């Protein structure tokens, strides 16, 4: 009788008539309390209904009656696993497998429990055993692929995921996971293919859209990434991860203000999400709102005091721009103390965690405080080399010098900015004009987007590599090329290059003045500078050995001016305005020098100062405008009558603005470099005064090389007087213009610095082996 009732209950169970099934299971148990199958099936029903705790008790009763039933132990394991009691689940699966070792599905379940318990190695063994016993287990193959990817065993991951797609070709998940493997390999084109395949199979797969967006971000195709994230949100607005990714994509476009609501939305669905909290801090940091950024870094650190990106930014973040000199001092002291704190933290930190911190920040803005940064740069450099050497010990020891006699020297150049960028314009002449009879030139471009400048530079060298996927990929190529000398055109502007510079990849390593400050790195041997730019005590400002190339130190090509330049009216400038072009990034303007502009305006009628808006944010532009308003107010002048801000311009429009201007005002303590050279090409009179450090003496050096010293002020008073005279004395202004035009040949296309560089490099190598 009980057997018939049990069969009837099971039929109800299978057909989804669960209430009827439950009644009959209870009836069977009442009639025969030793009916283990009834206890087991009743437990399975409770499990299906989501009452896992009841299921556990019922199945345990079944096992007490029939302890050798393997399926009972598996069912108990499933109930424990669904209830979150992972170790008990593992124990139950192991009991099952002790009774039935070839039970492939249970090995899969054991893998699921290990995986949920963060035991990656245990899960891998379980899944591998499962697929050996039964090769068509999709779950085991798919999850193996996920775990192999996490272990960076990418070929294994690809193999098992391909098997999974063959077993279940219409299941989108394995295709999506294949895309993630290729993302991990930084093969973004292939990743995009597989994510798209997943979406074809399941157009509502929000995770696949999110992952596709991440792959597009890997290729720097941010607009396509944003489209994917919007689609993800449309399908599933409660998917938390997309808000972090969307915000990061907007930040990559410089749209920090737009990113903030998406980060905050991510926090609404996951309030303790430390990565999103830190990302919010970064967004406020890049908006120039330092104090707001600090609040979010503090919030992140209350969740995890050792979260490296938040910790490093909390202690070492610097504002983009300052409201006054007191702020400069306050933030500098904060950075100095923070550097000591981080140095102590690194002593006990996990190597990879420390690397995350190092990768999250640079000292870029430190140099815009107008101080001697040698000691602070050296402290940060010591941190960098320590962290990099622990993470990459194989790339941190000194390279032995090979015999260079009777062969060409192998010289490498690396930068993220071998594209239409100041760095490329300043240093392409070295790459082009190093004598190919004596040098094989290797170029390593680590930026994501190439352009006509990239193509041009590639044509100048014997070996060109465009590698933006990872530090490891760049380093491995450099090591394969077995260079004699590696030259960094800039350090301090790109996280990738900054970390590479902290490694020892060639016997001799040099730094150029693309970012004109000492690296502070023991891995950099020489700083390649300019004899005209350095002050007499210049060597004291560097941890590297200072090398003075003649003139301005570079071979700079004559800029090509637009055939049909825009006129003043197109920049909202009047014909009778006296236009002073001051076109630097706003972080170059120190607040103690704001008075210079109203001091000139007070004496030059219809003076108009033209600035370029911040690339970072409107907030930074508004902060600078507020400073200028205060400075002009102190002179009883209205800032808006004299100051014009233009948006970022195309290269040709920027040159048109130079051609439409009357006078170029150099920034104080951080001089124009490429901008000054382009102003010279447009025959603009350059007003400058030499700063304390090389970075404040670029324009001074350029004018000295052209033997035009009458617009160089010995001090700020002279600077203002020269600017005023140029504004009021049109005849003198034209004389200076004519002189500049006549002397272009003294500054442009000068090959002597590159010839000197070649001789220096050969001398260094020959002395090393003699």
PLM regions and their residue ranges:
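Conserved nucleotide-cofactor-binding alpha/beta core module
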Residues: 392-524, 529-539, 609-753
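Structural signature of tandem alpha-helical TPR/SEL1-like repeats
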Residues: 2, 14-23, 48-61, 71, ...
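N-terminal subdomain of nucleotide-sugar transferases
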Residues: 264, 277, 286-464
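Active-site-proximal region of nucleotide-activated glycan assembly enzymes
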Residues: 337, 357-387, 505-565
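Nucleotide-sugar donor-binding and catalytic loop/hinge architecture
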Residues: 394-410, 562-580, 602
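Conserved donor-binding/catalytic core segment of Leloir-type glycosyltransferases
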Residues: 408-416, 574-590, 594
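Conserved alpha-helical positions within TPR/SEL1-like repeat arrays
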Residues: 6-10, 14, 37-48, 71-82, ...
